[in-house]
């Protein structure tokens, strides 16, 4: 294989590694939990990781209880559950 072909292969492998989300084995287990509004009655806009869509999405949190799949920012959710 020519050096140009090897360079192209290396570039494609690097791009694939950067774009591939973290696997379920590397993701914290709480990322797999459904969002829980908790037992209080506030109506706080929060972010959770949706395992089916592999995206962070909005839900409304009651202010207490719930689980750890509850983030205050999109960046925090993405960094923790989706990957870099």
UniProtKB/Swiss-Prot annotation:
Family designation: Belongs to the venom Kunitz-type family.
Tissue: Expressed by the venom gland.
Cellular localization per UniProt: Secreted
Annotated PANTHER family: KUNITZ-TYPE PROTEASE INHIBITOR-RELATED
Keywords: Disulfide bond, Glycoprotein, Hemostasis impairing toxin, Protease inhibitor, Secreted, Serine protease inhibitor, Signal, Toxin
The organism of origin for this protein: Daboia siamensis
Name of the protein described by the UniProt record: Kunitz-type serine protease inhibitor C2
Function text: Serine protease inhibitor that inhibits plasmin and trypsin.
PROSITE patterns linked to this entry: BPTI_KUNITZ_1, BPTI_KUNITZ_2
Covalent S-S links between cysteines: 31-81, 40-64, 56-77
Site (Reactive bond for trypsin): 41-42
Record InterPro entries: Kunitz_BPTI (IPR002223), Kunitz_BPTI_sf (IPR036880), Prtase_inh_Kunz-CS (IPR020901), TFPI/VKTCI-like (IPR050098)
One annotated Gene Ontology cellular component of this protein: extracellular region
